[in-house]
């Protein structure tokens, strides 16, 4: 068999120069290509077919990415437009309406001030007519009473009311003989904290300055009358 191969390789053939070697060259190239591909596969190198397949796969994602923006734009075009928010202060207020609103606000302020001024005298009047309750105590009595001084118009009215409350005679006045001869005398504490006899000042001054009343023994109230006189003389 080896001899036959040698004969084929060394066999002389008839033909044009260079025309007889075409088949041999093609066979040699095919054998070389097969040898190179075998080596590439063993070394895990990419062959020509593998490179073409990879290029095809790379082109497919690029085409899909190019399609996505176009599809998103088409979907946005199909959506209805969002409603526009109404601007604050729209529609604009005309000038004459604005002037009317300004005049109304000024009028309301003036009316409020007028109402306050009208209410102020009424509040003062009600305050002046308010009650003036004071406590009344009597030495030896086991209870206290309260009287509204503004319910009486004079010392005489107050004395009669106290007699009904405590059932005893109470002297009011700055006469020392009256104080000495009475069993009980009505005194009061003023705003300064001083104790004085009831009746030693004008009635209205007494009502404004009295804090509380006390019915005490006449012997204990002897020194109060002169002190009350001196006090109000100095004030006058």
Curated annotation (Swiss-Prot):
For bias kind Basic and acidic residues, which ranges apply?
62-81
This protein's record includes keyword Lyase: no
Q: Mind listing the UniProt keywords for this protein, alphabetically?
A: Auxin signaling pathway, Nucleus, Repressor, Transcription, Transcription regulation
One of the protein's GO biological processes: auxin-activated signaling pathway
Quick check: keyword Chloroplast in the entry? no
Give start-end ranges for motif EAR-like (transcriptional repression).
12-16
Where is the sequence biased in composition, kind Low complexity? 52-61, 117-130
Q: What is its main location?
A: nucleus
Its quaternary organisation is: Homodimers and heterodimers.
What this protein is called in its record is Auxin-responsive protein IAA13
Q: Which gene encodes it?
A: IAA13
